Amino acid sequence: MSDNSGSGTSPWGSLNTPVGPPKVTLAYFSNEFPPDDLNFIVRKLFDRTSKGPFCSIDGVLLCAIQFANLIGHYETTDHLFPFGSSIASVAGLGIGLVAAAAVSVTPSLADLPVAGAEAVRIAFRLGVLVDGVSQNLQPRDRSTTGTPDSWAYVIPDVSPEVVQKELDEIHSREKTPIPSKIFVSALSRTSVTISGPPARLRSLFRLSDFFRDRKFVALPVYGGLCHAGHIYEQRHVQEVVEKSVLDETHVRYSPSVRLFSTSTGKPFLSTSVTNLFEQVVGEILTQKIQWDKVVKGVLERIQELSATEVEVLVFRDSLPVHELVKALKSADSGLQTTTEDLLQWLHQSRERLQGPRGSLQSKIAIVGMSCRMPSGATDTEKFWELLEKGLDVHRKIPADRFDVETHHDPTGKRVNTSITPYGCFIDEPGLFDAGFFNMSPREAQQTDPMQRLALVTAYEALERAGYVANRTSATNLHRIGTFYGQASDDYREVNTAQEISTYFIPGGCRAFGPGRINYFFKFSGPSYSIDTACSSSLATIQAACTSLWNGDTDTVVAGGMNVLTNSDAFAGLGNGHFLSKTPNACKTWDCEADGYCRADGIGSIVMKRLEDAEADNDNILGVILGAGTNHSADAISITHPHAPSQAFLYRQILRDAALDPFDVSFVEMHGTGTQAGDSEEMQSVTEVFAPIANKRRTSKQPLHIGAVKSNVGHGEAVAGVTALIKVLLMFQKEAIPPHAGIKNSINPGFPKDLDKRNINIPYQKTAWPRSTDRKRIAVVNNFSAAGGNTTIAIEEGPLRQTIGHDPRTTHLIPISAKSKVSLKGNIQRLIDYLEVSPDVSLADLSYSLTARRYHHSHRVAITTSDVAHLKKQLRSQLDSADSHKPIVAAAGPPPVAFAFTGQGASYGTMDLELYHESKYFRDQILQLDSFAQGQGFPSFVPAIDGSFPKEHTHRPVVTQLALLCTEIALAKYWASLGVKPDVVIGHSLGEYAALHVAGVLSASDAIFLVGQRALMLEKKCQAGSHKMLAVRASLAQVQEAAGELPYEVACINGQKDTVLSAAKDDIDKLASVLESAGYKCFSLDVAFAFHSAQTDPILDDFESVSRTGVLFQAPNLPVISPLLGKVVFNDKTINANYVRRATRESVDFLSALEAAQKISIIDESTTWIEIGPHPVCMGFIRSAVPSIKVASPSIRRGENNWQTLVQTLGALHLAGIPVDWNEYHRPFEQALRLLDLPTYSWNDKTYWIQYNGDWALTKGNTFYDAEKAAKAPRVGGDLPPSPISTSTVHRVIGETFDGTAGTVDIQSDLMQQDFHDAAYGHKMNNCGVVTSSIHADIVYTIGRYLHTKLKPGVKDIHMNISNLEVVKGLVAQKNRDVPQLIQVSISTEDISSGTAQVTWFNVLPDGGLDEPFATATLFYGKANDWLQSWIPTTHLVLGRVHELERLAEQGVANRFSRNMAYGLFARNLVDYADKYRGMQSVVLHGLEAFADVELTKEKGGTWTVPPFFIDSVAHLAGFIMNVSDAVDTANNFCVTPGWESMRFARPLLAGARYRSYVKMIPTEEDAGVFLGDVYIFQDNKIIGQVRGIKFRRYPRLLLDRFFSAPDAAKHGGKHAPAVKAAIPPALEKKSAVVVAQVPVVDKPPPTKENAVAAPAAKSPEPVAAAAVNEDSITVKAMALVAAEAALDVSELEDDVQFANIGVDSLMSLVIAEKFRETLGVTISGSLFLEYPAVGDLRAWLLEYYG
């Protein structure tokens, strides 16, 4: 409270205590956002936040808003800042109390930003702490959307004593763990607020009679628990606050203003700012809010001051403010009370800040660069070599540009010729790695080479900058832009214009250059192509700096490009007197300078604001201090330079950068080598940087000048960035290269006193070392023929010192590429680097290659501890690089499974390096230990931190809690690295950690269960009386050997791994007997015999405390249960009885894994990580799933934790699991440096369209010669407009009607957007497949059209699609540039019959039709008849639905959520687009299921019955056949060729809800074929049916063969399909023969071009067996055939017919696929029809394969 007199004085001052009755000012800082739209934004922010503590963001934003509005209020009003006075007061709630504390210690408004920053720091750390603690009580469910769960409920009209009594009774009765207790967190006169974990709050109001009958409101408290004295301690407070910097500043920050405690209403009594913040944070964490006491305290303060006027400052109105103001107004009738809203000024102010940001802008750091310069300068090192040698690299115009002999005329008399034959050119500008940049050869060839090389150099510059997308805030993809200068379009105008094609515009127009860079890297920031003629690239860089200064971007890639191919520009510049006729680059500053020499060049740099670059740990090559552009408006002509304009710009740049001209020690001049240009520029430079009058440069202030054009010519649009890269290299090399432009003598127009001015032209390489007393600062100047001038001031980058050290001694060195050629090149480049850098830090190398590089599909990863070993391994990898298989990106990363180790892996004291050296891991352990101690358990840290000897025996409760919490902390550590499980399994005690990670148990509850169980064991069981014995034998072997000896089976871990429990003496006897029988035995170091009768005394009590003290939640990912031997998905299975049984009953690890395999939850692609102190489960897993590729531990006993982790990280990386390397290195990043490593080794090929001849009009194209070439078919050809057109029916191409008969033919193009999207909405094997629902929509459309044409008066048309049979499926091709046409015909002989026939065809390239691939019969019917016919069936089907529901509640049937159902569907076969995903939940039991369906509201196209509607209600059958554990989905997949009938009596409506039911039954004729009837219900009535839907089982081996795009071989598909069909030929008619695909081998015959047909007249001659090499393809092929047919090879005699030994159409396809996979021989299954006898095939194989 303060006096507010003295109006009109600056608001930034402070006040003394006034004399007389004061006006009292009280500021209230709320704990809620103002009710403006920001509130909505922050809630949305919570919804979208995928990781990290939301409450820290919430708190930071709230503080920032309050401080900003407080400052804005006082700056825009005439009010004085009142809080410098000791009579002012502040109050606040929650985070608002932190903001209030900052205001209370601030002497003036000018000092508030510093105090505010301190408050923001504390608010952020407080939020992180609260989130971490709260997540261990109840993890936030990220899978849900909408309003998050509240941690606090307010109950009105109830006594706090009554509430507390009720809570105490509940906690006592239910034995609630202390951290999980519900508690009173706030009191007011009218209400009580209770807080706790959201699930427990919901349970309280659901189960307690007292609370259930009360009104309550969930508060918007989403971040976690505060005001919880039973959870937080003083150490938490100190962890948040640490020491405030405000106690150490020169400004006197002190707690001089009264701040009211929200728990006592009394002012905080603090001795320092740190102490005040500690009290405030302690108040928020441990004390309940009692706002009535604050109101009372305020009233007492007003009475104490005898105040007559009170002003209450608020951030909008709120309930606490209302109560306070009401109390003030009723307390004293003489007290005048006013309220001032600190947000009101925002709405009253009309002024907006305009104009530039001023000179105090951020410096701009250049953090990466790359170039392609003339004469082989393919990187910056080669460019420097060229410069330091002083080379002039001009040459004659090369033949790949144009014919210099015909296009050059030194006399200038011939029209359109060049006066000079010279230029400076990039070698082989057509070289490009098209595959790397996802460009087809055709697109690459038609794309301007300068744009291609801009893309390449941008990548290299980013690579050298250590760029990884979204690694930091400055590398957020939405905040990165590209800026490139380009002043010509030669390639488009000349080369591609000869034959204009698809990419003429996107490959040649300037805007696409930077745009393509943005698109490739997925930058969402701006992209600019800027043309200012010769200054384009430097002006572009200046524009990029402006973008950074204005905050439009945080990172920019900028540069320039120029590749010369057009003779017109040479002719034009020559005629304009710009070019030199003589053989030189540019004779810059020479007396005979007569013009410039044109040049190629590409340059790219990466820039950030300096503070961002330093925060990102970047290498800073140079720092831009200022940049500007102006125009020579007063020049004598537009092309003539103007010294005064240039000088004006220099002074402006120096002024803005706060530089003295003498600070500049080098000027890189434009220096084109023209008399006028050189003289004008020298005049401006000498005038500003080296004047002769007044102050002069001393001998210690030399100014060197240079011009790179004398070396590499004038690159025009690239000239500026070329000069800038030269200066950056000079900083790096600490040298100035020699000037090469003066061939004779110096320009006579230059000042004669250059030496007096201390201006130096370096004729030799000159040292330019870094010095401690003076920074090296350079100016780069560039001007334009169009009149512009651009100048940049740049200084050397700062030297950065490492802080701390990296304790890790083992490091991962990964190398990757997009092709094998590049992988080998990258390996060789790293070997070469290590040869010249033998002392490189491996820590820096690992950091640079992991956290600061992109990772591509071809990968190598080496774990190493020294450089010599690394080089040896690299050479080994180089030799084997050809055998590396790439990661298939399209398939996504493989699933990850966490296996949590049981107690058998425990050992005395772990002494983990992770605990000592990883702050994140240690913090997790300490937080979990705090929970354990808070529940009354002893600290388990001594079992982890090494404070006891390794052999020390801790109490069981300590050992078991240490194991649990180590595993939880390890899982969290992996999660922090971005590695999260898709499925979990826990072995014995490890299951508790697994259940926590799966979301079933909170960390607090897991600790409670394990701790209670351990205490019960200690109390009720005798330690050491029983033992556990691991035996390397199967259970059957143990039973046979042990005979009648007493024991119990504790664990079945594998086929040959069994663990037994028994009394100690019995175990000893058992071990002796088993070892005598030859079985290895190991006694486990455990105190008790788990899973045995020894645990019986604790079971009842343990189940009781588990039931009342713990909340079991639904798992958020599959849990493989070793107790049940199945996978758990639902929320009913795991409960108190489950953990009881898990304590007593056997661990059947083997059966659990087998069950998970059976339903494809795990398979050979699953990546396993063992979570525990030593790997135990890995062996069991490898035994159960022998084909798995990765099963790695987190920690290994006796091995440094980092070494184990690095090895596992390497395995994950090679498996394609994304790792957050940034997070892995974060704790040590200040000790690490980004190395300037070799850039990517490109797999370059030449893409170049040669300019031909001397053309004018035709320009050498052959378009008209090829005019008669066949055109690609178009939908419908040249036909009039179609009478119908939908998303799947595009054109009617023919129709005939004759009375009641009619035929309609339509064509559709799969490549049309809606059709294409519909196909890719049903994706199989990463291909778009035209599902039967799409065919159905076509039939409904054309069927309605046919009926309307023949019976135009009928409106109510209902159709039954019957006998649909798809004999050859339809897969969308990859190439969308050409049509993919189908034709569908519908015909009826008499519409009155109510039937029509439908046939589908593929349209061939020549416009003809292929054989029909599908047929159906259409029946027209009446909906009411259908509805009546279904009534008798309804109750039977509903009865089955209810039975399934009952089975699901009992945990017998499986219930799947929408995400889980479609996730499994996608994993096993079909990846549906979102609008196809109508099933909201599925209950599945065996081959029977029902689904609740909600159709999408989004139609997105023109449909008769949207395919995604049909699929949503019908594909439950496919879900059963491809997900159910009753089907072997690991080895087979199932697809449908059609159905008997599909009809809907009511239309399927967007957004409507339905229920589908189906039971699939194997047919008697063929066990591999299944039939079922799908019923569709709405409001318990059957409204639709798909009767007789058929599914056929096929080996998964054939998936590629059946579901590959028809053009996959041409367009980079994974496999070239041998057949067009997506539906396997086993369902085809006998007449449908698949055309053979000739095998692909190195020998000539087996190719499409020179295929050898099977002889028609005679069979191949039999071949003697002796002539066959046993290692030959033929021998291996015949062995493979024999194995598949279950025969001995000797039975395959030449006269044996394949048909007689069971090689049918299906087996032939399987054999063909195995030929391809095993032998590399690609054939069609029909080969066995062409060569029906063994001898025929053997002879064919020998002929072509040997």
UniProtKB/Swiss-Prot annotation:
<dbReference type="InterPro" id="IPR020841">
    <property type="entry name" value="PKS_Beta-ketoAc_synthase_dom"/>
</dbReference>
<feature type="active site" description="Proton donor; for dehydratase activity">
    <location>
        <position position="1511"/>
    </location>
</feature>
<dbReference type="InterPro" id="IPR016035">
    <property type="entry name" value="Acyl_Trfase/lysoPLipase"/>
</dbReference>
<keyword id="KW-0597">Phosphoprotein</keyword>
<feature type="region of interest" description="C-terminal hotdog fold">
    <location>
        <begin position="1452"/>
        <end position="1600"/>
    </location>
</feature>
<dbReference type="InterPro" id="IPR049551">
    <property type="entry name" value="PKS_DH_C"/>
</dbReference>
<dbReference type="InterPro" id="IPR030918">
    <property type="entry name" value="PT_fungal_PKS"/>
</dbReference>
<feature type="active site" description="For beta-ketoacyl synthase activity">
    <location>
        <position position="534"/>
    </location>
</feature>
<dbReference type="InterPro" id="IPR018201">
    <property type="entry name" value="Ketoacyl_synth_AS"/>
</dbReference>
<dbReference type="InterPro" id="IPR049900">
    <property type="entry name" value="PKS_mFAS_DH"/>
</dbReference>
<dbReference type="InterPro" id="IPR009081">
    <property type="entry name" value="PP-bd_ACP"/>
</dbReference>
<feature type="domain" description="Carrier">
    <location>
        <begin position="1671"/>
        <end position="1745"/>
    </location>
</feature>
<dbReference type="GO" id="GO:0004312">
    <property type="term" value="F:fatty acid synthase activity"/>
</dbReference>
<feature type="domain" description="PKS/mFAS DH">
    <location>
        <begin position="1290"/>
        <end position="1600"/>
    </location>
</feature>
<feature type="active site" description="For beta-ketoacyl synthase activity">
    <location>
        <position position="714"/>
    </location>
</feature>
<feature type="domain" description="Ketosynthase family 3 (KS3)">
    <location>
        <begin position="361"/>
        <end position="796"/>
    </location>
</feature>
<keyword id="KW-0596">Phosphopantetheine</keyword>
<dbReference type="Pfam" id="PF00109">
    <property type="entry name" value="ketoacyl-synt"/>
</dbReference>
<dbReference type="InterPro" id="IPR036736">
    <property type="entry name" value="ACP-like_sf"/>
</dbReference>
<dbReference type="InterPro" id="IPR014030">
    <property type="entry name" value="Ketoacyl_synth_N"/>
</dbReference>
<dbReference type="GO" id="GO:0004315">
    <property type="term" value="F:3-oxoacyl-[acyl-carrier-protein] synthase activity"/>
</dbReference>
<dbReference type="GO" id="GO:0044550">
    <property type="term" value="P:secondary metabolite biosynthetic process"/>
</dbReference>
<feature type="region of interest" description="N-terminal hotdog fold">
    <location>
        <begin position="1290"/>
        <end position="1425"/>
    </location>
</feature>
<feature type="modified residue" description="O-(pantetheine 4'-phosphoryl)serine">
    <location>
        <position position="1705"/>
    </location>
</feature>
<dbReference type="InterPro" id="IPR032088">
    <property type="entry name" value="SAT"/>
</dbReference>
<dbReference type="InterPro" id="IPR001227">
    <property type="entry name" value="Ac_transferase_dom_sf"/>
</dbReference>
<dbReference type="InterPro" id="IPR020806">
    <property type="entry name" value="PKS_PP-bd"/>
</dbReference>
<dbReference type="InterPro" id="IPR016036">
    <property type="entry name" value="Malonyl_transacylase_ACP-bd"/>
</dbReference>
<dbReference type="InterPro" id="IPR016039">
    <property type="entry name" value="Thiolase-like"/>
</dbReference>
<dbReference type="InterPro" id="IPR050091">
    <property type="entry name" value="PKS_NRPS_Biosynth_Enz"/>
</dbReference>
<dbReference type="InterPro" id="IPR014043">
    <property type="entry name" value="Acyl_transferase_dom"/>
</dbReference>
<feature type="region of interest" description="Malonyl-CoA:ACP transacylase (MAT) domain">
    <location>
        <begin position="898"/>
        <end position="1218"/>
    </location>
</feature>
<dbReference type="Pfam" id="PF16073">
    <property type="entry name" value="SAT"/>
</dbReference>
<keyword id="KW-0511">Multifunctional enzyme</keyword>
<dbReference type="Pfam" id="PF14765">
    <property type="entry name" value="PS-DH"/>
</dbReference>
<feature type="region of interest" description="N-terminal acylcarrier protein transacylase domain (SAT)">
    <location>
        <begin position="4"/>
        <end position="227"/>
    </location>
</feature>
<feature type="active site" description="Proton acceptor; for dehydratase activity">
    <location>
        <position position="1322"/>
    </location>
</feature>
<dbReference type="Pfam" id="PF00698">
    <property type="entry name" value="Acyl_transf_1"/>
</dbReference>
<dbReference type="Pfam" id="PF00550">
    <property type="entry name" value="PP-binding"/>
</dbReference>
<dbReference type="GO" id="GO:0006633">
    <property type="term" value="P:fatty acid biosynthetic process"/>
</dbReference>
<dbReference type="Pfam" id="PF22621">
    <property type="entry name" value="CurL-like_PKS_C"/>
</dbReference>
<dbReference type="GO" id="GO:0031177">
    <property type="term" value="F:phosphopantetheine binding"/>
</dbReference>
